[in-house]
Amino acid sequence: MLIPQINKFTRNIYITNAYFLPDLGIVQALIAARQRGVDVQIMFPEISDNIVVDWIARGIATDLLPGGVRILQYCGTMLHSKTMTIDSEWSTVGSANLDGRSLTANYEINATIIDAAFARQMEAIYLNDRAQSREAAVDKWVRRNPLQRAAELSLRPLRGLF
């Protein structure tokens, strides 16, 4: 459902996700969208209620940043949103995180809304949350603590369990 939408649109993709653990297909689609000139921004919590998920998400961000995808870590209170808007036209919101279990095994559901007015409202919320976020800079990201980066890489194979 998501990859065709990511591949179809041309201007922007704004994702907010509490537990950002996408599979390789979604990661590749997001990087390809950025390479086509799409403004791809992903927001997830700086700190969530699951430290293992936080570490895995940062490891995935390490793959996305060099491809030009903007990573924002939300610094406000608890972020539990699961939204995506594309090109001020297409939106999804619901209970499903971008992780394998939410998309295939858990009893999660998202609504897809194709409505420009709704998408603009979703984008306004995203931009408000973005103001409370810290954007990851590629040069600083790659210079993070080597032990932290090693831990993120070693936990990556576990992303399908969450």
State where each predicted segment sits.
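PLD/PLD-like phosphodiesterase catalytic module centered on the HKD motif
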Residues: F9-I15, Y19-F162
